[in-house]
């Protein structure tokens, strides 16, 4: 079965691409490589072939400065409080999820995610490609 990115992941990536056309994409990704294959990861396809994670390169401006990703990661975190398509976010050694009320807390995984922001999605995002209401990527929230 050919892997496919969940609709919510496709939509979020499209909004980022539309609003930051000159951004660096070298740390972007969605489909797990050999490092992901040996362990559970939302980058690995499930039984239906659906992948529920994206990585967005930190360099949104294409010039490294200004560093906008901390602000975008925080806006995604705020949106996730009401948008049930987002499962969790990892960025700059911190993770946010519903477990702790979407507050940032220390992330102790292997990769601190300093070069990209990781967003994982719930099964609700599999078929839901509705617009993310996030100010830095076209929303008005």
Question: What do these predicted ranges mean?
Answer:
Residues 1-101, 114-121:
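Secreted/periplasmic proteins that engage bacterial cell-wall peptidoglycan
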Residues 3, 123-141:
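Low-complexity, Gly/Ser/Thr/Pro-rich intrinsically disordered linker/tail segments
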Residues 104-111:
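Short proline/glycine-enriched turn/loop segments at secondary-structure junctions
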Residues 111-115, 128:
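Short glycine/proline-enriched turn or capping motifs at secondary-structure junctions
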């Amino acid at each position: 079965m050919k892997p496919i990115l969940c609709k919510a992941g496709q939509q979020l990536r499209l909004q980022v691409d539309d609003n930051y056309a000159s951004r660096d994409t070298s740390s972007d990704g969605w489909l797990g490589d050999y490092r992901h294959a040996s362990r559970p990861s939302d980058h690995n396809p499930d039984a239906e072939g659906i992948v529920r994670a994206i990585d967005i390169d930190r360099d949104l401006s294409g010039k490294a400065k200004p560093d906008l990703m901390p602000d975008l990661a925080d806006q995604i975190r705020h949106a996730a409080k009401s948008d049930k398509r987002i499962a969790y976010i990892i960025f700059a050694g911190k993770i946010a999820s519903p477990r702790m009320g979407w507050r940032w807390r220390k992330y102790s995984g292997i990769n601190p995610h300093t070069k990209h922001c990781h967003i994982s999605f719930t099964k609700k995002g599999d078929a839901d490609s509705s617009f993310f209401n996030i100010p830095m990527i076209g929303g008005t929230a």
